[in-house]
Amino acid sequence: MFEPTAIYAPNPHRYDTMTYNRAGTSGLKLPAVSLGFWHNFGDITPFDQMKSLVFTAFDNGITHFDLANNYGPEPGQAEKNCGLLLAKYFKHHRDELVISTKAGYEMWTGPYGDLGSRKYLLASLDQSLERLGLDYVDIFYHHRMDPNTPLEETMGALATAVQSGKAIYAGLSNYNGETLEKATAILNELHVPFVL
């Protein structure tokens, strides 16, 4: 369907006007604006429209592409389409990009298809990497709190993701302040680079 790579010459001045800020206390810099793949990257959006959005973003210094395993429609489709774009146009720019993905919402049926168990998170990350066509993501987030799974298990799964080289940083999304503080303490104790 797509040739492996195609010529894309990004704007040579793409970094001149974008502001980049450190993510938390890490050394990672994120652009002031990120490109979220929640909408406009599912199976109902024409590929040329997706390509135009990504090119416009990157040409303006937007280097953070934010995904989740369930973004679509259909679940997983945004990661698949991002993977096609990366393979076709951004192969030589991977080190200029911060690719993040998340897991926590329902992705498949049965008792292991959502929330925060070690089994779900690590399986989800492997599936996301396959859809994206990548060896690693820059940030792997737990997408929502899971009151029924011990926080130590969920943070341990994020630690495993980083220690295995499948993620560079761990992140948390949709956590309340109290739980975020506890999770941060666990990640710090495990020496896991944590950005958000």
What residue spans do the PLM features occupy?
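N-terminal binding-site loop/beta-alpha segment at the start of enzyme catalytic domains
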Residues: 1-97, 163
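Beta/alpha (TIM)-barrel catalytic core signal, keyed to glycine-rich beta->alpha loops juxtaposed to Asp/Glu
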Residues: 2-17, 145-196
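Active-site mouth loops of central-metabolism enzymes
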Residues: 36-48, 106-122, 143-149
